[in-house]
Curated annotation (Swiss-Prot):
This is Protein SFI1. Belongs to the SFI1 family. GO terms for biological process: cell division; G2/M transition of mitotic cell cycle; spindle assembly; spindle pole body duplication. Residues 846-901, 917-946 are annotated as: Disordered. The gene is SFI1. It comes from Saccharomyces cerevisiae (strain ATCC 204508 / S288c). It is found in: Cytoplasm, Cytoskeleton, Spindle pole.
Length: 946
């Protein structure tokens, strides 16, 4: 792959070829499109022509004709969705005629060919190449089968089958085959398959361009048709709204007037009947109430009378009984005084017994109360004792708990201290033994790896030198041929890169054109839908406002008309009521007068008939009477028949009127039904249909928005996932790199800290060892100095005694081999009591000294003032033979310990300041602690001098 890396890349770009349309839709003239049949009208015909047929075509449903082509859409229809060119490519070009192939070849050869197809496809997918080579190769195999050639014996088939077995490698053989099939065909079959592939691609491109132009024209035509349709709908809507307002208002006015009159008449009749019934009911109720109350009053009077009679009889009986009883008692009172005395004695005895019993009861009660209180006190005392015992137990328990808690806490503290000590020891061991040992082990491994790499590089260098010598021995012809091949390959690669760059430019131009076309279609759809919704919303709102205003005005007018009609009807009713009363009075008067006149006429007629009968009676006979009776009977029958005919005529007229009124009522009901209820139902149904249509459109729009949002969310989620994955990957790489750097830096810092601590502890151990050695040296010197001082003290005392005094004055000095002669005699003041204290003080003072320890025998220039005075006194008086002896200096241990620089008589390693140990390399106080340790590690004299 290293040799063919650039070739692989150029071939990959070569296989991803795209085609640019030969002519864009903006460059094609209108006349050419009309002649080719791609459009049916020119721009002038669209502007100046009528819009009726476009509206009809736009309102038709979209129906694809089965006889039309795959990409041919009828003009002025909505654009169909674009067809995936990859699927078309596979369907039109790459499908094998499997029936014919199986007819010519056996199953084994078909399986071999299909296996090779799958291997080629896997190879192209593995190296991220286009599948155009597979399509051309399939066309090539189909052409071979059609020509009667066995594809299994083909040269290129066998080469591909051999090369694609096992692992996929992009070598020069496959590159040459790709070049033959894609760029330079060597036989007519390959050229024919390549031509078929290019023809299919060009066909797809032409169909796409044709579909694009047709879609644009259909879009413009639909937009124009929609505008015209909106104008027509607006005009029709205005006409329909005017007519509906006109006819509905007239019908409503007539129906309202008729309904109001009918309601008034019916309500008046109901009111009259209601008033009459209420009057009758009130009259009957009053009568019933009066009858009931009258009966109650009568019953009460009878009851009181009965009670009065009964009470008078009872009172009389009781009075008689009481008077008789009183008389009887008075009569017996005279005879029964002894009985009265006995009764009073018994009463007195009862009183005495009662008092005695009362006193006994009081005593018993007090005794019982005292016993009760005593029991209560005993119970309370027992309860208090129990409580005190419980409290004592609680106290003991609390003390024990507190003690155990403290014991547990101290035990836990000790455990924690032990755990902390063990952890610190473990960390120290891990730091010292793991880190340092591991670092040394890694250094050794690194050294071994460097040595091995150097050996490998040496072998490689030797091999390269041998290879160079071998290539130098080759012929010049091979060298020139390789140079020629390289130059030709380089030129071919540059040409391929140029073609790929041109194809990429064409692809980007085509993609941008398709993107702009798609955006234009989407924006056109959105604008048309927005115009529709805005127009519908605008005029729907205006129509709703007008309908609400009309309804409110109709309600107000109907209310005003009803109020006026009620007032007019009440006025007419009042006038007619007055007239009816007057007419009733007149009618009654006329009836009375008419009755009087009829009575008078009948009386006069009777008188006249009687007079006529008296005049004509003698001349009339029976025959004449019978004839006259017959005539009268005929005349009366005629009159009766005539009256009956008149009554029948009146009855028929009344029946006709009733039938007419019934028919009128039925017609009126039907008219009301068709004018009012049907109109209301139609309006409600129309409103329901409008609302349903609006909701349907709104739902479709919402579904489109939701789908687009879901698609956008999916795209955004994928984009965000990819972006976050790349960010996460880079962040993870940075964290990994930083963690490696941090580990390296921490390892370096830990190594530095451990080295510092090891140096410090090694220096401390060296100091301790040196101090031990100096202490031994000091002890030897101190022993010698002590012996020397004791000898000198014994000599001075012996010389200063009066028994050993001499007359001559000599200079008494004891010379030691350690120090030189001094001008004055030196001694240690004090007595033998301070020897041990002095030795211990000097030991503790010079326990940490770093230089030579001075001798305990000091000169007068080094001793203090008291020692100087004593030495001077001894030198002046004692040695000159004075009779008085100077007192020895008194030793004060408190003063000496106070003047000492240190009171410690041994080396205490606990006084060495502790250095906090931590594994973290960011401790900023390492140098300060080291300085502090160095400062405290000095001797007391050096610290005093500072």
């Amino acid at each position: 792959m290293g040799k063919f890396g650039t070739t692989n890349k150029s071939t990959e770009n070569l296989l991803r070829d795209k085609f640019v349309p030969e002519t864009s839709p903006t460059n094609i003239p209108t006349d050419v499109l009309i002649k080719q049949g791609q459009i049916t009208d020119s721009t002038e015909s669209l502007i100046h022509g009528g819009a009726e047929r476009y509206i009809v075509n736009a309102l038709k449903p979209i129906e694809l004709n089965k006889t039309e082509g795959f990409f041919e859409d009828p003009p002025f229809h909505l654009p169909s969705p674009p067809v995936d060119s990859t699927n078309l490519e596979y369907e039109d070009v790459t499908d094998l005629p499997k029936n014919g192939l199986r007819y010519d070849l056996n199953d084994i050869s078909v399986e071999v060919i299909e296996d090779l197809y799958r291997q080629i496809e896997a190879f192209l997918v593995h190296f991220k190449l286009s599948r155009s080579f597979l399509q051309i190769f399939k066309n090539y195999v189909n052409i071979l089968i059609q020509e009667g050639i066995n594809p299994l014996r083909d040269e290129y088939f066998t080469i591909l089958e051999d090369e694609l077995k096992g692992f996929f490698t992009f070598n020069s053989v496959i590159e040459e085959i790709l070049e033959i099939f894609l760029i330079h065909p060597r036989n007519k079959f390959i050229a024919l398959s390549l031509a078929e592939y290019t023809y299919a691609k060009n066909k797809i491109r032409r169909h796409f361009n044709h579909w694009k132009t047709v879609c644009e024209l259909n879009e413009e035509a639909n937009r124009f048709a929609n505008q015209a349709k909106l104008r027509v709908q607006e005009a029709v809507f205005y006409i329909w709204s005017d007519k509906t307002l006109k006819y509905s208002q007239m019908a409503n006015d007539e129906a309202e007037s008729f309904r109001n009159t009918w309601l008034l008449f019916r309500s008046f009749q109901q009111w009259i009947t209601l008033t009459q019934t209420l009057k009758e009911q009130s009259r009957l109720a009053d009568q019933a109430f009066l009858n009931k109350m009258f009966r109650k009053i009568l019953k009460a009077q009878e009851h009181w009378k009965h009670l009065e009679t009964v009470n008078t009889d009872n009172i009389k009986k009781i009075f008689l009984r009481t008077t008789f009883h009183i008389w009887k008692l008075r009569h017996k009172e005279i005879n029964y005084h002894g009985l009265e005395r006995r009764i009073f004695e018994r009463i007195k005895q009862k009183v005495i017994n009662y008092e005695y019993n009362k006193s006994i009861a009081e005593k018993v009660r007090s005794f019982s109360l005292q016993r009760k209180y005593l029991n209560k006190w005993e119970k309370k005392n027992i309860e208090n004792e129990d409580k005190l015992g419980a409290l004592y137990e609680l106290e003991n328990k609390f003390i024990k708990q507190k003690f155990f808690r403290k014991l547990n806490r101290s035990f836990q503290h000790s455990q924690q201290e032990a755990i902390a000590k063990s952890k610190l020891n473990q960390t120290l061991l891990r730091c010292v033994f793991e880190k340092m040992w591991l670092k040394r082990f890694e250094d050794h491994l690194h050294l071994y790896s460097i040595v091995s790499l150097k050996e490998a590089n040496l072998v490689k260098r030797i091999f390269h030198s041998w290879k160079k010598l071998l290539y130098i021995d080759l012929k010049a012809s091979d060298y020139s041929r390789t140079n020629l091949l390289k130059s030709s390959l380089r030129s071919w690669k540059l040409e391929v890169k140029l073609k790929i760059f041109e194809q990429k430019c064409k692809k980007s131009i085509q993609a941008s054109a398709y993107r702009t076309w798609r955006k234009r279609i989407q924006y056109g759809k959105i604008s048309s839908e927005h115009v529709k919704t805005a127009f519908c919303a605008k005029y729907l709102g205006v129509w709703k406002r007008r309908m609400l205003q009309m309804n409110s005005m109709n309600d107000e007018a109907s209310k005003f008309y009803e109020e006026g009609l009620v007032n007019e009807c009440l006025a007419i009713w009042k006038e007619r009521l007055i007239k009816t009363k007057e007419l009733e009075d007149r009618y009654n008067f006329l009836c009375k007068t008419h009755a009087i006149l009829t009575v008078k006429r009948t009386l006069m007629h009777i008188d006249n008939v009687h007079l006529l009968y008296t005049k004509l009676a003698p001349s009339m006979d029976r025959v004449k009477l019978s004839k006259a009776f017959l005539k009268w009977r005929k005349a009366t029958r005629f009159k009766v028949r005539h009256k009956l005919n008149d009554i029948l005529h009146v009855y028929e007229k009344s029946k006709e009127r009733e039938l007419q009124s019934q028919l009128f009522n039925a017609w009126r009901n039907r008219f009301c039904f068709y004018t009012e209820e049907c109109n209301i139902q139609a309006i409600s149904k129309r409103n329901y249909q409008l609302e349903k249509m609006v909701l349907k459109k709104f739902r479709e729009r919402l579904l489109e928005i939701v789908k687009s949002e879901e698609l956008a969310d999916e795209v955004r989620e994928e984009f965000v996932l990819v972006k976050t994955f790349y960010i996460w990957k880079t962040h993870l790489d940075e964290i990994f790199y930083m963690s490696t750097l941090l580990e390296q830096s921490e390892a370096n810092k830990q190594f530095i800290i451990t080295s510092k601590f090891l140096k410090m502890w090694s220096l401390r151990f060296l100091k301790i060892k040196r101090n031990d050695e100096t202490v031994e040296v000091f002890r030897h010197r101190w022993d010698r100095a002590t012996v020397r001082g004791l000898l000198l003290l014994w000599k001075n005392r012996s010389d200063s005694s009066p028994k050993r005094r001499k007359d001559f004055n000599l200079k008494h000095e004891l010379k030691t081999p350690i120090r030189s002669d001094s001008q004055n005699a030196s001694t240690i003041p004090g007595s033998e009591r301070i020897k041990q204290h002095r030795m211990e003080a000097m030991k503790s003072h010079y326990s940490r000294a770093r230089r030579a320890i001075p001798s305990p025998v000091k000169s007068s220039s080094v001793l203090d003032s008291t020692a100087k005075k004593q030495i001077n006194l001894e030198s002046t008086t004692g040695l000159n033979g004075s009779p008085t002896r100077g007192k020895p200096l008194r030793y004060s241990p408190r003063r000496t310990t106070r003047n000492m620089p240190s009171k410690v008589d041994h080396i205490d390693f606990g006084r060495i300041p502790a250095v906090p140990f931590s594994l973290s390399a960011n401790s900023p106080k390492i140098d300060q602690d080291m300085d502090y340790i160095r400062e405290h590690d000095k001797s007391p004299l050096s610290r005093k001098r500072q």
